[in-house]
Structure formats: C-alpha cells, structure tokens
C-alpha cells in the first residue's frame, strides 16, 4: 500500500464534509474501506476508495446522502446585508433581481461543490450565475424567452477582441449613414455639431443639448435648423417605410401595461429612433457567430428603454431623469430623446465590463431552458440538491407583457397562456394562478432530493397570493423550516413611486422536502382569524408606539402564514389592507434627526 495515497480520519472527514465520528462509524460498518497501519494501528484510508464513496454521496440513491446533506445545513435565520450589483448584473434591465451576495450565501449554506442547484423561475439568472461562481452545477428554467436570452448571453464564452471588432464595424457603418440625423448648430459659432439630448413636450421639441468641438456643451431652444432636421428624418422615414426597408415591431401594447395613450410598441419611439434601430437590428442579424450576434443584441435590447419616449425630461436643464421607473409603458408629457450612437456605445462599454468580470466563469456548469416550470419533464426525480427561486407574485409584475418590449424586436415566440399571473384582461384569474403555482411546487418537490432544501423570496402583501404560494408548498409535501426578512439591495420601481406604502424587504421562506410527506401534510384555517390579526397588530403597535406600513406588514404576514389565518369566518380570504384601515389610524408624523425635519407616516392604535 502506497502511504502517499493514504488519508487520515480527519482528512477524510474534510474531503467528504462529514464529522470524524461519522467517518469512523462508516469504517466500522464497512461502508468506508480502511486499513490499520503501523504499530499504532490507526485507521488509514485509500484516496481512490474515498473518491468512489464521494461519488456515491453525490448520487441521488446514496444511503449516506441523507446524513451528508444534513451536515451543516442549518437554516439561515438572519438578514444578510445586501451588496450593490456588480457590472455583470447591470448588463441588462430585469425586474426583481436579488442581491447576488445574498443568493450566494444561501447556495453556499445549503450545497457543496458539484451539487446541482435549480431555479425554476430564473429571471435574470442570479441563482445560476452565482452557482457557477461557486463551482456548482445549475439548472435555470423560465417560460419567458427574454429571460433565457439574457442569461445565456451573460454567461456565454466570447472572444472579447472579436466582440469589440464587430461592435466597431457596425457602429461606424451606422454612424456614416445616419449621423446627420442628429445634426444641430452651435449657438455661439454656428458650426454644425452633434445633438446629445432633445427634450419634447407632447409631440413638439422644446430644447436641444449639443456639444460643439470649439465651445463645448450647450443648451438652446429649438431653432429653424432643428425643425428642418425633423422634416428631413420624417421624410426619410416615410420613404424607407414605403420601400419596405424599415423593419420594426408594430405589435399592440398589452392592456395590462398600457398607459398614456400609446397603442403600439413602435409608438414608444420617434421616427428618427425607428430608422436607426431598424438599420442596427439588420446589421446585427447578419453576423454569423451566434454568441457575438446575441451579445450585440443584448447591447441593442438593453439600450431600447434609454432611446424610447419613456424617459422623463427636464425642459429647463435639458436633461433626462431615470426612465421606466414604473412597470407600465408610460410616455411622460415632457420626455427626452437621446442620441442612439451615444447610448449604444454606453451599453457596449457596460456589457464589455460585465463580460470581463465573468471571463473565468465556466458556462457549461449552467443548463438554461425556455420551458414551463409546472412541467419539469427534463429533470429526473430526486436529482436536485437545492432550489433557490423567486416565484411570480400574482399581479405584482407583468413580466411577459413588459418583456414584450424586447421580445418583439427579437421575434421571440412567447407562451402567454401558460404565464403564472393574475391579469383580468387575459382571463388570467386567481384560480388559474393558484393552480399553476401549485403544479410548479409539485414539480419542485418531485425533482428535489429527500431531506434537501428549497428557499424562495417573496414580496407581496395580498393574502390571496400568500395563501396560493404557501399552500402550494405544503400541499406538495414541503415542510416550512423558517422565515427571514431580507433587506433589498435596491428599491423596486413600485417602491420608487409609492415609498410610504410598500414593503422594503423580501421574505425568504426555507422549506425542506420531507420524505413520503406528500400525503401527510394537513392544516386547518384558524378560527376567528380577523380578531387574531387585529389583536396581534394592536399589541405590536402599542409596543412600538406605531409602525410604518413596511414594518407592520413585515411583522404580521409571517404570523398570518404560520397560523393559517388567511380566511374570515365566512371562508373568504381576508383583505388585510381593509382590515388594517378599519381598525387602525394612519397618521403623518414629523421626525427630527441630524438631517433636520422630515415627514413620515405610521399606523397607530385608534
């Protein structure tokens, strides 16, 4: 026996991530072959034998798997301070992106290297990307083709020099052809120079911001030259449209996300922007290298909101404000039109920075699929080590309707009928949502290994949605192990519009797949639930001397969930917002702190 290949009990324990007592017990039972070496007769283990056992431990049928996976798998019970998103998560906008370091900590806590992590509602792919960074394999599922496109493009292996070469070629060709569409005149010297920003009021340009090579940045009222340029590009637009050269989507905007009178996707852009975008799209389509083509399309689609009419403007300063801050297609009365050349170059630089950050990532570790999470037919039963996901919140975010803004430019086919959402315009009601989410949790239960964990984040205060989600988990056979209120890295668009009434964090629910529990899960709705909720809130408000909406909901919702206090005595789901308004007062208060006087709102006992 070669002593160089022999490991001590401690070394084996570290290799297999189990205790030394477990190693000794497995050796005594014959599960781990061992050798008595030297006068001391200490146990020694052959490294080849240990590698074979390690493979067994990772396999779904291993008798050791249960004890192995429970080793150090302690449910997280504290808030993890979120960190800002690194560059590779800023490559493309997507809703509900979770703090990468929080997701990473959960993956590290519940898995080991080589394990398989599943996210059946993948979104922007944080779970899959963080899994790859940690040398875990992963499966990402999303019915939205835009989600799949973003994640695959983010993790794809591309030659950076080739990417840079194609970008410059396309950019220069487009610039030579259309740069004059952004021509304006410097108010100081009268020289022709390039416009950076136009500020519109309704359908009329009010201000122009440009840059002169001699006099630098300037702001001016629109003049006759600028008006002549509008006539020029509108004539060009009509000419190209008549000859069939222009190709852009004219799809109707879905009713759920429609706002401010725009009926079609193309109405969210100026004619000048449509000329540029149509030409740019055609150039990208001609690229043969699929990964390069997709990455340039990622630059293209990530730019679309920034060059649309949805960016609020400031007439006096001739600048733009943060755009698309609400989950609707809204064109403000005063809006901006930005220079597409500038925006395309900025998006290229952002995406290049993100790709450089992920240069060492092994893209083969992540398997990404465009499919329905309620039918995971391509995943074997009991094969997944851990699930971390962020399920759709009923009607909170219309992912598919909003992604239509991008999907239609890329000609993606979308299965709207299978979307998990509440949308009365599409006859997608609560019953449909609850049924689909329940089927998804059944599939998650099926593919997860016994005694392994599922974590999901949730951010909603409608008890109907909580009831559908949590009962879907329990009916599938999962056992609730704990709830954590997790701070968010950044506020959502909804929070930005309505800060005083929204939750500031996400709940992270941790469930365990208990073997043979699928037919044993029982629960009863609490009787006198409304009285229970009111009394619980009253005690909380008295103790805290009032609470904000966020503090109140973040306190009461987990209590309601744990006690199944969803329904009133008539069996109807409680409208918790109405119940709170009926029994408590919402008052404006003045706060004094080191920054001076500030206003706040809080709930108090009547």
Question: At which residue positions do the language-model features occur?
Answer:
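Mobile active-site "lid"/loop adjacent to the S-adenosyl-L-methionine
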Residues: 392-443, 451, 455, 459-464, ...
């Amino acid at each position: 026996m070669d002593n160089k290949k022999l490991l001590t009990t401690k070394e084996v324990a570290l290799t297999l991530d189990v205790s030394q007592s477990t190693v000794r017990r497995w050796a005594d039972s014959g599960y781990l072959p061992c050798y008595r070496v030297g006068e001391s007769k200490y146990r020694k283990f052959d490294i080849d034998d240990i590698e074979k056992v390690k493979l067994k431990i990772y396999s779904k049928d291993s008798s050791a798997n249960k004890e192995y996976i429970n080793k150090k798998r302690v449910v997280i019970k504290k808030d993890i301070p979120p960190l800002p998103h690194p560059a590779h998560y800023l490559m493309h906008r997507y809703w509900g992106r979770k703090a990468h370091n929080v997701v990473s900590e959960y993956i590290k806590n519940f898995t080991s290297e080589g394990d398989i992590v599943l996210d059946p509602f993948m979104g922007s792919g944080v779970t899959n990307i963080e899994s790859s960074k940690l040398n875990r394999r992963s499966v990402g599922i999303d019915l939205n083709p835009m989600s799949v496109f973003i994640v695959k493009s983010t993790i794809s292996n591309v030659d950076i020099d080739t990417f840079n070469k194609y970008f410059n070629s396309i950019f220069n060709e487009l610039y030579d052809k259309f740069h004059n569409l952004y021509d304006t005149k410097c108010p100081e010297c009268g020289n022709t120079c390039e416009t950076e920003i136009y500020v519109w009021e309704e359908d009329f340009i009010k201000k122009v911001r440009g840059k002169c090579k001699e006099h630098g940045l300037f702001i001016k009222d629109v003049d006759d030259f600028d008006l002549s340029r509008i006539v020029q590009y509108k004539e060009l637009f009509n000419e190209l449209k008549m000859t069939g050269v222009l190709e852009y989507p004219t799809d109707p905007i879905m009713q759920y996300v429609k706002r401010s009178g725009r009926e079609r996707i193309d109405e969210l852009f100026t004619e000048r922007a449509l000329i540029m975008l149509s030409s740019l799209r055609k150039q990208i389509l001609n690229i043969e290298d699929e990964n390069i083509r997709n990455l340039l399309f990622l630059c293209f689609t990530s730019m679309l909101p920034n060059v649309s009419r949805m960016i609020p403007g400031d007439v006096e300063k001739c600048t733009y404000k943060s755009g698309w801050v609400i989950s609707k297609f809204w064109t403000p009365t005063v809006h901006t039109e930005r220079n597409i050349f500038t925006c395309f170059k900025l998006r290229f630089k952002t995406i290049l920075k993100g790709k450089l950050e992920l240069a060492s990532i092994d893209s083969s570790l992540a398997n990404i699929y465009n499919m329905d999470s309620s039918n995971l037919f391509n995943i074997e039963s009991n094969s997944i080590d851990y699930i971390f996901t962020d399920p759709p919140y009923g009607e909170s975010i219309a992912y598919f309707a909003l992604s239509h803004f991008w999907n239609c430019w890329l000609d993606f086919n979308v299965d709207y009928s299978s979307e998990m959402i509440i949308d009365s315009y599409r006859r997608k009601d609560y019953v449909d949502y609850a049924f689909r989410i329940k089927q998804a949790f059944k599939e998650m239960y099926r593919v997860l290994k016994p005694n392994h964990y599922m974590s999901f984040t949730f951010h909603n205060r409608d008890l109907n949605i909580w009831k559908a989600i949590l009962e879907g988990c329990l009916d599938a056979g999962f056992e609730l192990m704990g709830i954590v209120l997790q701070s968010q890295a950044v506020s959502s668009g909804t929070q930005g519009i309505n800060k005083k009434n929204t939750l500031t964090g996400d709940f992270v629910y941790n469930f365990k797949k208990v073997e043979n529990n699928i037919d044993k899960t029982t629960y009863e709705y609490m009787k006198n639930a409304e009285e229970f909720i009111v009394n619980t809130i009253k005690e909380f408000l008295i103790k805290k001397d009032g609470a904000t909406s966020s503090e109140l909901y973040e306190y009461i919702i987990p209590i309601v969930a744990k006690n199944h206090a969803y329904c009133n005595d008539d069996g109807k789901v409680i409208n918790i917002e109405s119940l709170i308004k009926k029994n408590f007062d919402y008052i404006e208060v003045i706060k004094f702190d080191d920054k001076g006087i500030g206003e706040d709102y809080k709930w108090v006992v009547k």
